[in-house]
Amino acid sequence: MKLGVVGLPNVGKSTLFNAITNAGAQAENYPFCTIEPNTGVVMVPDQRLNVLAEMYHPKKVTPTTIEFVDIAGLVKGASRGEGLGNKFLSHIREVDAIVHVVRCFEDENIIHVDGTVDPGRDIETINLELIFSDMETVQRRKDKAEKNFRGGDKKAGAEAELAGKIYAHLESGKPARTYDADDEEKEIMNGWFLLTTKPVIYAANIAEDDIGKDESEIPFLKTVRSIAEGERAEMITISAAIEEDIAQMSPEEKAEFLEEMGIGQSGLDRLITACYRLLGLISFLTVGEDECRAWTIQNGTKAPQAAGKIHTDFEKGFIRAEVVPYETLVEQGSMAACREKGLIRSEGKDYVMKDGDVTLFRFNV
C-alpha cells in the first residue's frame, strides 16, 4: 500500500515525512524544497510480533510495512500546471490514500505561504486543485461516452449520465468520494481514476506545547475536524517536530518520553493505525523458528488469496488453511498445545481471514 503525504509549503510535511521514514528528506524553510517525491517504507507497529518472537526465538522477525511518498508542495493553480502542480497531480494518482498535513500552529519563524495560519483555507486550496483536475477528467469521459452512445453503444449512455452527475457534484466543491454511488456507478467510476475518490487522513500538525491538550483547547482543530467529518475523511493530531525527535530515540527512550508526556502512543503509530483502518487493512501472522511475520491483506480476503501473498504457488495449489487466533496461541503457549486441545481449525477456500489469524497454509503444486 502506498500513501502520499501532501500539504502546502511550510506546514510541516517534510518534517513529518522525516519522522515517518528517517529518510532525511530536506526540510527547509522555503517552498518547493521537495521537488521529486521521496519514498520510504515504515514498519506497521504490531505488539503481537514481539510476543511471538519471545515464544519462538526466530532467526528473523518481519513486520508488515506501508510505503509513504513525500509529494512536492503546490500552490493555487496547480491543476493548470502552476508551481509544481503537474508533478504533484501525477504523483497523487499513484497512491492508494492521501495523508494531508495541515498547519495548526503559529510560529513567526516559519513563514506560511499565504502569510497567515488558516487550516480551512489551506485544505480548500489543495482540495480545489484536486477537484479541478477531476472535473477535467470527468468532462473528457462525458464527451467520449456521449460520442460512443451516438455511435450505438447503449452502455455509454449510463456513463455519460453519471459523468454529468459527478461533474455537478465536483462543481459544487465536493470531492467525488462524498457522492453516494450505487454498485454499478462505483464500477464505472473506478475506471476514471479520480483523485478525489482516494481516502484522506488529515494530519493536524499542532505545536509542541499543545501535545496532551484536549482537542477543544486548540481552536484550529475544530475547523479540521468539521471538514473531515463532512467529507468522510479521518483526522488525527500530531506534532511533526516532536515526532522527528522521537524518531531518533531508542525504543527505551521513546517509551520513557511518551510516558513523561502522558501519551500512550506516538503520533506516527496513531497515523499508521489510522491508515490501516481507512484502507480496510488487516494482518494475519505466520510463525516458526525461521521467521515470525505479519502479512497485510484487505479485510474480507479469503484464505487462498491470503496464501498468495506469501507465494503464488500457495494460492494455485491451495488445499486448506490451519488457523488459530493469536490470543489462543499465546494463551496455550505453543501450536503443539493448541493442536493437542483441538483448537486449530481447518479452513477451506471460502474462509474469510480475520485480523490476528496465525495461519499455516497447506498446498500442493
Positions of the model-derived regions?
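Short, flexible surface segments
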Residues: 94, 354-355
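Conserved Switch II/interswitch segment of TRAFAC-class P-loop GTPases
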Residues: 40-45, 72-82, 93-156, 169-182, ...
